[in-house]
UniProtKB/Swiss-Prot annotation:
NADP(+) binds at residues 175, 178, 181, 198, 204, 262, 309, 342. PANTHER family: GLUTATHIONE REDUCTASE. SUPFAM superfamilies: FAD/NAD(P)-binding domain, FAD/NAD-linked reductases, dimerisation (C-terminal) domain. Pfam families: Pyr_redox_2, Pyr_redox_dim. It comes from Streptococcus thermophilus. This is Glutathione reductase. FAD binds at residues 14-15, 34, 41-42, 50, 115, 303, 311, 439. The active site is at 439 (proton acceptor). It catalyses: 2 glutathione + NADP(+) = glutathione disulfide + NADPH + H(+). Signal peptide: none annotated. One of its GO terms (cellular component) is cytosol. It is found in: Cytoplasm.
């Protein structure tokens, strides 16, 4: 017997949860399938535990670098990593509980088993068949290992969250968000951490002026940055340490190797070939601006599509899809332009819109004007452990519409959200100039640049 629903959601990550709940709120009969822990990458091995670890690193930096400058004579007797890990997991467990309460409140049925397509509108789960006119694929992605000898001796970001102690010596290989964040956390928690990137700087999609500040801060406080370094081999030694070789003839021996060299979409293992759904050249599921795949009635969003691998993007896309399918908002869709983002580096980076380089490439240098301010945040200014903060506005045309806003420094991670609203609304430099600053704050620099 086939069980009938209005909406089947395959994947219990951020996008799937958001879409399932919104559809049920509009009266749809919804069932969600997830073979792992509810919450997906973000809650279990991504944003949430990463941010907890970043906060732990912030506490360490405060104690080691700034407490003395504020007059506190601090003696650190011990750092118990097990306590941090246990409290982190307890926090995640509470989030799991909130998801379950939300499902119950909205009437979302769920089965914590893997689903598998048997045809474009039917899935099999634990021997039962389920069908619906609308099926969402929100299966997320997974971290990759490089194809080099010995790569299996390293771990990925998933394995980072399984560590039971801070490694004495760590190599992090990669140049994106995950690599920079993990390396920064381990460095702050006391590991001798080395970050290896293949090209001339990490976070190459971010504004160069901002990343230059990050690179300078790494040179002062760590992690040790190695550029133009592409790993070629990993050897496991008799004492379980790892020796990594690079194409620039550099070698390093560490206790822990973390790969952060990219992610791939989860498109196998659930019968996708039975549907006829098309994949992109990169192996992601193709979906259009309305999250439609190539097969009517099947939709895809989040990391499995490779559009923007950010949790709030998946959440918003999922809700908009359900508004369109179950609340008669036929034009509802996510605007993927001007999405703000933050890197929880040390110090944090925030950005929305075009970098200076991309703005010039798109509109021509003659149409772009850039404003920039650099200063020492007050929190770090009392003693010798000063951090630089840089903020930047990229404007277009005579009316100086702000098409890019970028910052690095203490507190930037909490500043960027409010400014992103202004950018989405089309704010100009004059709008910022006409805004009275809040003093003394770091964010006032964005509205006082000349």
């Amino acid at each position: 017997m086939v069980k009938e629903y209005d909406y089947i959601v395959i994947g219990g990550g951020s996008g799937g949860i958001a879409s399932a709940n919104r559809a049920a709120m509009h009266g749809a009969k919804v069932i969600l399938f997830e073979g792992k822990e509810v919450g997906g990458t973000c809650v279990n091995v991504g944003c949430v535990p990463k941010k907890v670890m970043w906060y732990g690193a912030q506490v360490a930096e405060t104690l080691h670098r700034y407490a003395g400058e504020y007059g506190f004579d601090v003696t650190i007797n011990n750092f118990d990593f097990a306590t941090l890990k246990a409290n982190r997991q307890a926090y995640i467990d509470r989030i799991h509980g909130s998801f379950e309460r939300g499902f119950d409140s909205n009437g979302v049925e769920r089965v914590y088993e893997y689903a598998r397509f048997v045809d474009p509108h039917t899935v099999e789960v634990a021997g039962e068949l389920y069908t619906a006119p609308h099926i969402l694929i929100a299966t997320g992605g997974h971290p990759l290992y490089p194809n080099i000898p010995g790569s299996e001796y390293g771990i990925t970001s998933d394995g980072f969250f399984e560590l039971d102690e801070v490694p004495k010596r760590t190599a992090v290989i990669g140049a994106g968000y995950i690599a920079v964040e993990v390396a920064g956390v381990l460095n702050a928690l006391g590991s001798d951490t080395h970050l290896f990137v293949r090209k001339d700087r990490p976070l190459r999609t971010f504004d160069k002026d901002i990343i230059d500040v990050l690179v300078d801060e790494m040179a002062k406080s760590g992690p040790t940055l190695h550029m133009h370094a592409n790993a070629t081999e990993v050897v496991k030694n008799a004492d379980d340490s790892l020796t990594i070789s690079f194409d620039n003839e550099e070698t390093i021996t560490v206790d822990c190797l973390i790969w952060a060299v990219g992610r791939a979409a989860n498109t196998s293992g659930f019968g996708l070939e039975k549907t006829g759904v098309e994949l992109t050249e990169r192996g992601n599921i193709y979906s259009d601006e309305f999250e439609n795949t190539s097969v009517p009635g099947i939709y895809a969003l989040g990391d499995v599509t490779g559009k923007l691998d950010l949790t709030p993007v998946a959440v918003k896309a999922g809700r908009q899809l359900s508004e369109r399918l179950f609340n008669n908002k036929v034009d509802a869709k996510l605007d993927y332009t001007d999405v703000a983002t933050v890197v929880f580096s040390h110090p944090a980076i925030g950005a929305i819109g075009l970098t200076e380089e991309k703005a010039i490439a798109k509109y021509g240098a003659e149409n772009i004007k850039v404003y920039k301010s650099s200063f020492t945040p007050m929190y770090t200014a009392l003693g010798d452990n000063r951090q630089l903060s840089t903020m930047k506005l990229v404007t277009l045309g005579e009316d100086e519409k702000i098409i890019g806003l970028h910052g690095i420094g203490y507190g930037v991670d909490e500043m960027i959200q409010g400014f992103s609203v202004a950018i989405k609304m089309g704010a100009t430099k004059a709008d910022f100039d006409n805004t009275v600053a809040i003093h003394p704050t770091g964010s006032e620099e964005f509205v006082t640049m000349r």
